[in-house]
Amino acid sequence: MKIFEESWEVCNKVGGIYTVLSSKAEHLVKKYGNDYFLIGPYKKNIIEFVEEDIPFELEQIYKNLLNRGILLHYGYWDIRGKPKVFLIEFYDFFKREINYWKYKYWEWYQIDSLNSDYTYDEPFAWSVAVGIFLEELDKIYNFNKILHAHEWLSGGTILYIKAKKLNYKTIFTTHGTVIGRTLSSKNIDVMKIIDKIDADKEAYSLNIHYKHQMEKNTAKYCDVFTTVSEILSIESEKFLGRKPDKIIYNSLSLEERDIKKEFLISRKWLEEFILWYFMPYYEIDLKNTIFMYTIGRYEFYNKGIDLIIDLMKYLNKSDINKNIILFLFIPTGVSGISGNVLKLYNSYLFLKEFFESEKTEIIKHLIRREYDKIKQLFEDYLPKISKNSKPSIVTHDLYEKTDIILNKLIESGLDNEEKDKVKVVYAPIYIGQDIIFNLPKEKILRGFDIGIFLSRYEPFGYTALENVYYGIPTIISNKTGFSLSLKNKNLESKYILLVDIDNFNDELEKIKDFILFISSLEFEKYLEAKKEIYNIAKFYDWKNEINEYIHIYETLNNLQ
C-alpha cells in the first residue's frame, strides 16, 4: 500500500492545515516509511523543500507530464520525519487546458465554474494536474493506493480519480466549509441560522457556488469523509449533504520541554524588542507590563480581530493598573519593513556591537565617573527621534493603504501614545521569515503572558492549541471546535478562559479580571500554571490521535 496525502499547504504555509500536515508527518513516516508521500503545489523560493532527482522508475512519467505543461518536482519536506514530497508545477498546464477541464467537470459533476475567479481556477488546475500525475502512477503501480485530500482545493483530484475509475481509495478531510467561512466573514453567526440556510442557493448569492459545488461533490464521492470537530460535522451534514464518517481532532507532535528555560529565553527576546521599538520614544515599566498576542490568518471577522481590538479599547480606558502590549501577528501584503522601524532596529544592533567592542573603555569611564565621555562615545550612534513622534503601530509598510486592522486600531485610539495603557505592535508577516522576527515562531511566542483567540468561525483552532502547548494562559472564544473539545474531554482550567462572544460586552470585565489574575501570579506560581496548561496539550498528541487515521488507511487497504 502507498499513501498519498494532498494539500495546497504542503511546503506552503497559508494557515492551520500546514500545521496539521507538518506536525503529523513524522508519525506517518514512522509507520509507513517510503510508502508515504505528500503532494502539494510548487512555489518559487520554497524554504523547506529539498529537491532530489526524480526516481528512475518515474522518469517516463516525468516526460509525459512535461508534454502536458506539468513539471514534477521530487524531494523531501525538511521537517521532522523528512517525508517524501511531490510538488506539482502546473502554470503552463493551467494556461493550456483550464477551460477544457472546467467543461469536463461540468459534464461529470455539473460544477458551474464558467464565471469562476482565480481563487478557484488556480487550485482547481493544480488538483487536476495532480489527478493526471496519479493516473500516470496508476499505470505502473498495481498495488493498493490511497489518496487523502484536504479541503475543496484538493477536491478536483478525488473527482478526477472517480471519473477515471483509477485504482485509489479516497479520503476527504474538510477543515471548514466554504459557505460557513464566507458567511462568518460577513459577521453572520452561522450556527444560529444554519437550519434556515439553503446552501446551494446561498452559494450562488455569495458567488462562491463553484467552490461549494466542488466541496459538496468531493464529500459525496469520496470513500471516507472526515472532519476535525463536532461543529464542523453539523455544518458539513447541513451544507454538503453528508455526515462525516469520523471526527478526528487536530493534534500536535509533542515533546517534553523545560518550560522555565524556554520562557526565560523567549522573554529576553521580547523585552529586547520592546527596548529598541518603544524605549527610544518613552519609558515602559517592563515589570508592570502584560504581554499578549494573537496570531492567525487575515480574516477580520472570522478570527475575531475586531473583538480583540474592542477589548483593548475597553482596557485602555479602564482603571486597569497595568501596561498591556498586544502583538497582532496577522500576515498580509507588505512591501518591506517600515523605514523608521528598520532604522531603530539597525541602530540597536550597531549599539550592541559597539558596546561589546568598547566595553573596556566604557567601564574605565564609569569607574572614573567620566559620564560625558560615555555620552560622547555613543552620541553619533543613537537613533534620532523627532519631537512628539511615537512608536509605529505597524512594523511593515502595507500594500493596502486602507488596511482594516490598522484603521480599526487608529479609530479605537490605540496609536501608541505614551499615556496609553495599551500599546500595539501589528506585525503583518509570518514569524521566522523576516529579519526583525527572525526566530522560529515558538521561540518568540513562548515569552508572552497571555494568548487571545476570539474567533467567530474556527472549526478547530490550531493557534489556541499551540498556545496551550507553549504553556501560555489562554483567552478563547466559545465558538471554536477546540474550546468545545476541551469541554468534551473535561479539560477546563482556571488558566484558560472561555469567552461567550455572543454576549461580548458583558464579558469584558471578566476578561479584565482574568488578565489581572494572571499578572498577579508570583513567578513560581506562574510556572506551575504553565505546566498545568502544557499538560492539557498532552491530550492532543499525534502519537495517540494518528491511530485514527491509520485505522482508516488500514481499513481501506483491506477493501481493495
Residue ranges of each PLM-predicted region?
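Catalytic cores of nucleotide-sugar-dependent glycosyltransferases that transfer UDP/GDP/TDP-activated
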Residues: M1-Q560
